[in-house]
UniProtKB/Swiss-Prot annotation:
Species classification: Archaea, Thermoproteota, Thermoprotei, Sulfolobales, Sulfolobaceae
UniProt protein name: Large ribosomal subunit protein uL22
Keyword Amino-acid biosynthesis: no
UniProt function note: This protein binds specifically to 23S rRNA. It makes multiple contacts with different domains of the 23S rRNA in the assembled 50S subunit and ribosome.
Natural source organism: Sulfolobus acidocaldarius (strain ATCC 33909 / DSM 639 / JCM 8929 / NBRC 15157 / NCIMB 11770)
InterPro entries, per database record: Ribosomal_uL22, Ribosomal_uL22_CS, Ribosomal_uL22_euk/arc, Ribosomal_uL22_sf
A GO biological-process term: cytoplasmic translation
One Pfam family it belongs to: Ribosomal_L22
Length: 156
């Protein structure tokens, strides 16, 4: 089994807080767009934005995997994208991850008001292969795709 490795950043290790959640039942396509939207934001800004998307006050822009996604009128012009969605399941996992990273930063003694998302990424996880029995002795495969997400918060 491979070892989990974070990217090498130019920020000192004592100014960083890390968190990872593995094998979550959320689409890696939705997680990719959520991560891209909040990358580089302050922690408070990211939470506020994600809560607005959960309440459907603002749509999450979809850069990739957006085929067939309709245009939304409540996307901010700063994104320069017209299509968006409300991926609630993915956002709940990302909010949980941000809470974990904030608690890690608090235990390290970092200033929570000055935390910025330095790195956030979503990766493909395991594929659980299952079979569903059908009539006349046949069976159909069912796949369940899992994902991983990681975040690094830095003190600015």
């Amino acid at each position: 089994m491979s070892k989990w490795v974070y990217p090498i950043l130019s920020i000192p290790e004592d100014k960083l807080a890390k968190a990872v959640i593995k094998n979550i039942d959320a689409s890696v396509r939705d997680l990719y767009n959520v991560c891209k939207a909040i990358r580089g934001m302050n922690l408070k800004e990211a939470r506020e934005f994600l809560n607005n998307v959960l309440e459907e006050k603002e749509a999450l822009p979809f850069w990739r995997y957006s085929h067939g996604t309709s245009h939304r009128s409540n996307i901010s012009r700063k994104w320069k994208v017209k299509s968006g969605r409300y991926p609630k399941k993915a956002i709940k996992y990302v909010l949980k991850l941000l809470d974990n990273a904030e608690n890690n930063a608090n235990s390290k003694g970092l200033d929570i008001d000055n935390l910025k998302i330095v790195h956030i990424a979503a990766h493909k996880g395991l594929v659980l292969k299952r079979y569903m029995t059908r009539a006349f002795g046949r069976s159909t495969r069912k796949y369940k795709y899992l994902s991983h997400i990681e975040v690094i918060l830095g003190e600015v």
